[in-house]
Amino acid sequence: MADKRDYYEVLGISKSASDDEIKKAYRKLAKQYHPDANPGDQTAEAKFKEASEAYAVLSDPEKKRQFDQFGHAAFEQGGGGAGGFDFNMGDMGDIFGDIFGDIFGGGRRSRASNGPMNGANLRTAIRITFEEAVFGCEKELELSLKDECETCHGSGAKPGSSAETCHKCNGKGQVTFTQQSLFGMVRNVQTCPDCRGTGKIIKEKCPDCYGSGYISRKKKIQVSVPAGIDNGQSIRIRGKGEPGTNGGERGDLLVEVNVSRHPIFQRQDYDIYSTAPMTFTQAALGGDVRISTVDGDVLYEVKPGTQTDTKVRLRGKGVPTLRNKDVRGDHYVTLVVQVPTKLNNEQKDLLKKFEESVSGKKSEDTTTEDTKEKKKKFFGK
């Protein structure tokens, strides 16, 4: 027997690969090398057979156990199929149906499509302010939604006429067809192309809805935005999506919330972050600093000698949680000392006197000595 590659190597997987990983690897190779997708390519056909043989073994728990223990020698006495053993193609029907459906455009086997089907969800977006996201709000949307046509009452047929049973699928909404493959005939089921799964054909269409059974109308919808919602989250409004078919329920409306940036506040989860200014005097002597919060301004008492970039925590001044609006996050504030940019002569003298009292030196003398020293270094004297 000619040398054969390890089955795991053929599929490009490890020995610890799960059943899903084995199936996924085979699916990829089968789609790539299937003879019908590569007509006349003998190399592709050989690789397809090799991958199919590997999958037939590794997808069967008993054969996989034998291969893991004895390798290819476990099947040398099997005779028959490619590679010295006979594998059951019936066990591979599901994956073949999936693969051939992808390659040839056929659908996967599915439940009858002419039963009740819920409508699709609709998506839209709203923009709200930072404060509206924190405390919640009410918004009104105007959307174009489909409603049952009043002329035909949703049948899609012209008044006085009725829909007929589809002859192609006999009212089932699905058609079955077979395809010849390398391994025999493969059975596929797909939605009927004539009636699109409804099982009925409308020959005389309603003049108002043109056979769809629905009319689009502008509607106003109230959106209750809960307190604590964050940017990018969505609100689900049930029953405001696309109408269902064959008695199915309407889909839902998903409203994505976009929160505008705030000039002062930033948010992380349920906590708020900001900065607040304090004067040099407040930092040195202590006192009340005014801090802006989403609830309004509050006074925070700083201790004498508070340094710039000091962080303080205002408990319960953050964002309400979605589960319980009475529970709120915190507000973290970074205190920043504001240095005055314009001083009059009197203010400058006072600061100089303060500096002298701290350093023990006259500010003018210190400046003069510094200036002299710099000049000496510059002129080399």
From Swiss-Prot:
Quaternary assembly: Homodimer.
A Gene Ontology BP annotation from the UniProt entry: chaperone cofactor-dependent protein refolding
Domain of life of the source: Bacteria
Biased composition (Basic and acidic residues): 356-373
Record keywords: Chaperone, Cytoplasm, DNA replication, Metal-binding, Repeat, Stress response, Zinc, Zinc-finger
Reported function: Participates actively in the response to hyperosmotic and heat shock by preventing the aggregation of stress-denatured proteins and by disaggregating proteins, also in an autonomous, DnaK-independent fashion. Unfolded proteins bind initially to DnaJ; upon interaction with the DnaJ-bound protein, DnaK hydrolyzes its bound ATP, resulting in the formation of a stable complex. GrpE releases ADP from DnaK; ATP binding to DnaK triggers the release of the substrate protein, thus completing the reaction cycle.
Gene that encodes it: dnaJ
Cellular-component GO terms for this entry: cytoplasm
Binding-site residues, Zn(2+) 2: 166, 169, 192, 195
Protein name: Chaperone protein DnaJ
Cellular location(s): Cytoplasm
Family: Belongs to the DnaJ family.
Cofactor(s) listed: Zn(2+)
InterPro entries, sorted: DnaJ, DnaJ_C, DnaJ_domain, DnaJ_domain_CS, HSP40/DnaJ_pept-bd, HSP_DnaJ_Cys-rich_dom, HSP_DnaJ_Cys-rich_dom_sf, J_dom_sf
Chain intervals for the UniProt region annotation (Disordered): 356-381
Note on domains (UniProt): The J domain is necessary and sufficient to stimulate DnaK ATPase activity. Zinc center 1 plays an important role in the autonomous, DnaK-independent chaperone activity of DnaJ. Zinc center 2 is essential for interaction with DnaK and for DnaJ activity.
J domain mapped to chain residues: 6-71
Coiled coil regions, renumbered to chain: none
Matches recorded under PANTHER family: CHAPERONE PROTEIN DNAJ, DNAJ HOMOLOG 1, MITOCHONDRIAL-RELATED
NCBIfam families documented for this protein: DnaJ_bact (TIGR02349), PRK10767.1 (NF008035)
